[in-house]
Amino acid sequence: MVYKFDPVDFNGTTFHLDRASGMVKGSTQFTGQNLPIPASYFPKSLTFDAASAKLPDMFHMSRGYFIFSERARAVIEDWAPGQVEFIPVACHAQPRIAATLNFDSAYYFVNVLGRAQRLRWREIPSNKYPTQRDGLELLGLTHDFHKWKLRERAPGEPLIWHDTPWQDGNKKYLGQDNVLVEDVLWQELDANFPDQLHPLRAGED
């Protein structure tokens, strides 16, 4: 059983970041090639200028860019050592806002290092992108994660990963934008941090 990793909270729900808290332009050149984003592309600090609740342990800075607390880092390091890079980020807020957020001892941007090719592309719907000049057809995942199908995890494969692009003749299938999590790790995160993850179970209606 596999889940699409998706924290419930992001900038604009329980908190709001200032305008300077953004990724350096150019980071998409790495995600497009299914490569980890170099640490130098991440902001060194985040400034919170509003808050309505305690800061969660896992959240989006913006869609697709995740931040973990020290507590969440410890769970990942225990269950999936070496599969995630944690890039420290300093968090700042005025005293009143900081009191609401109740900061943990440290926060980190998350670079998911795990890679595996587990999507069963021939059995699932896909979106077609413009054909390349060399005739290569590019296809990607639909947003309907209920229809995604994945093979079983092989021994030694990561518990949290980006799926590796797969080529079949002149067709190349791309699903690396999503972070996928094996059930055992997702359940551990959910147990430690209840109601912080959307239960987006792949392949089940």
Predicted regions and their residues:
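Phosphate/anion-contacting hairpin/loop surfaces
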Residues: 1-205
